[in-house]
Amino acid sequence: MQLVSCGNIFWVFLRALTVLNEPVSLVTRLVALERIAGYRVDQQAREDLGLIPQFGGTVGAVRTTLIRALGGWDQTMLTEDTDLTFRCILAGHKVRYVNDAESYEEAVEGFRSYWHQRSRWAKGHMQCAFKYSLRLVRCKGLSFREKLDGLLLLNVYFVPLIVALAWIIGVALYFTNPQFWLQSFWSLIPLSFYSAAGNFAPFFEVGIGAYLDGRKRIYWLIPLLFITFFINIAICAKVFLELCISRIIGKRQFVWKKTLHNGYGNHYINYSPKQLPRET
């Protein structure tokens, strides 16, 4: 944690490497895949390119003087980690990511808990997008690359909405004039390339992260990420509608629903050797 001693760096966060209860269920295994992609690839790329690493809330070191200077934690924000990250950046301070320092966590074990947790993340992230997007664009202390990356990061939970809207429009257009689309079949080629490089980018991140970590057997789970992909589309649509209604009626305070944990966050689950997953 030597970075903390640097004068202009007020926040360092670590990699959430190991999901201690990964073998418990399908959900914990999929969460482990998301963690590999989000930290091993996504956050490391932001750090290497000098962009804006986003504190994920798992573990890190932040100066208390910074928190006091920024007015403390904002209790109206559901994702206080993202909120404080951008308050720190906009105030001219640095946030750094350390991939070599490993941390551990307990993942949610069922789809109900996954839904509640990701709903809070989506709502809090959208709150931050409404609150900081314009300020980020106007900030004079950030480069164009940092502003662009920050905007993409803030608005990442709107992407599932755009994907769902594109599906709806595509189906409607097809049934409105199917003959036109059959004649324009060649247009599917660039669209396919765009989908492969854009919509499916998270799946590529998982594959690259698993490769870098040497976890070959986990590749077989990547197709199952489509389950959480569709779940997150539904989550983001519901949350966006709730936020729009809240802004119309003037509601600013949201209920924080605690994530259910079973106490596996500080030790490995006591499985027999035959039950533990093996990597080759």
Where in the sequence are the language-model features?
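Catalytic donor-sugar/metal-binding loop of nucleotide-sugar-dependent glycosyltransferases
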Residues: 85-104
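Juxtamembrane C-terminal module of membrane proteins
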Residues: 134-151, 169-280
